From Swiss-Prot:
Protein's name in the database: Regulatory protein RecX
Name of the encoding gene: recX
Predominant localisation class: cytoplasm
GO cellular component: cytoplasm
HAMAP family on file: RecX
Locations listed in the record: Cytoplasm
Function: Modulates RecA activity.
Family: Belongs to the RecX family.
Annotated source species: Neisseria meningitidis serogroup B (strain ATCC BAA-335 / MC58)
The keyword Cytoplasm is annotated on this UniProt entry: yes
Lineage of producing organism: Bacteria, Pseudomonadati, Pseudomonadota, Betaproteobacteria, Neisseriales
KW Cytoplasm (keyword) present: yes
A Pfam family matched in the record: RecX_HTH2
Gene3D superfamilies (UniProt xref): Winged helix-like DNA-binding domain superfamily/Winged helix DNA-binding domain
């Protein structure tokens, strides 16, 4: 039988594989902690030593998801992980990058422009579900199949 790992060793193993927010790390460690105080001590130590950083987690998350998702969805996901709104707002891509991402996502999913209103609504719902705001959705639907669409954003 394997000996039980200490909470500190578990945290180190988890963070060596992936960046996590404080809340995410707490969720993973909670079942193994003997007390809330022990868990908080480990979390505080890791934060002080900069082994766990909410800012680093937010940067990595946005970098990996911003090509497929809009700022609304990214903000919501970061808020669920305990990242404050100001931090997430500062890290989110600018409006033109978001519009280019929406156009790229739209062109990848739908190979041709909408033929009728029903198809256009389907495309708009798809982008809205991905977290793009109404202005970005309208811009993407308008310019996605135009030549030189990059300059219009």
């Amino acid at each position: 039988m394997k000996p039980q790992k200490s909470l500190r060793a578990r945290a180190m193993d988890i963070l060596s594989r992936q960046e996590l927010s404080r809340i995410g790390l707490k969720r993973k460690l909670a079942p193994h902690a003997e007390s809330e105080e022990e868990l908080e001590n480990v979390l505080n130590e890791f934060a002080e030593r900069n082994w766990q950083s909410d800012l680093r987690y937010a940067e990595a998350y946005i970098r990996s998801k911003s090509r497929k998702h809009g700022s609304l969805r990214l903000k919501q996901a970061l808020a669920q992980q305990g990242i404050d709104e100001e931090t997430s707002r500062n890290l989110l891509p600018d409006r033109s990058s978001e519009k280019l991402a929406a156009i790229a996502v739209l062109r990848k999913k739908f190979k041709h422009p909408a033929a009728d209103l029903k198809e256009k609504q389907k495309q708009a719902r798809f982008l809205a579900y991905r977290g793009f705001d109404a202005d970005t959705v309208q811009t993407a639907l308008k310019h996605a199949w135009d030549d030189g669409w990059e300059e219009d954003c």
